[in-house]
Every structure is written in structure tokens, then in C-alpha cells.
Amino acid sequence: MREPEGGSAAPPVRYHVGDLAVARIAARRARTVPGVVTLRADLSQTLLGLAGTWLSPDPVPAELRAEGVAVAVRGDRADVRVTVVTELGHNCRDLAATVQHEVGAAVRETTGLDADVRVTIADIELP
């Protein structure tokens, strides 16, 4: 690493990534995993979403929605909970492992945070 002129090293970078930013990253990546039909919001997210539609005239684009993902950022770690719906024919354990891996990688790549990802399969759609 190159030192700046004058011989002193640059101070360490301090930053904070918000819960919503991490949730959007996680939701976007989870939706791309084969076998994930949709993300499912829990009751608290549903109620917040209803309140948000009354307060905000501009809807959030689908690719930026974070329903189905709950995040708590603490220091250099993010606790991420993802709730998905799959379709019949996908192995739930394999799907959960893939979502966990993909979401964790996306959060690390984008934010630099280590992520503890928990996946819940809320429903299986039948043909």
C-alpha cells in the first residue's frame, strides 16, 4: 500500500450502512435465486407498508422493495432474516442454503459487512 506524501498513513475509513440499504441488497439478491417465487413480508412489515402507502405518494420500485427481509446492522455485522416462498419441486434445505450463501455474499461484496443470514421458507406454491 502506498503512503501519502509526508510519510503519514491515511486515517481509517469509518462508515455506517443502514438497515434499509442492507435489506434492499439482500432482497434483490434473494429474488434472483432459482426456486424463489417471491419474498413474504411478516406482519410488522405489512403494517409498515400500509402506513407507507398513505404517507408516500411515490411507490417504491419493485427491485428496491425489501418486504420479506429484516435486517439489524450492529458494528461490522448484519443480522439478516429472509422469508421466501418457493414452488413444489425445489428442495427446501438446498434452497435455504443457496439463499443464505447468495445473500451473505452480496452483503459482503456490496457493504463490507459480515452477514449472519437466516432463511425461512414460509410457503410452497402448488402447481
Which role does the model predict for each range below?
Residues 99-103:
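A short beta-strand micro-motif common to beta-rich folds, especially ectodomain repeats
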Residues 104-108:
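Short amphipathic alpha-helical signal-transduction/dimerization elements
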Residues 1-92, 98, 109, 113-127:
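Contiguous, often N-terminal, cationic amphipathic patches that form binding interfaces
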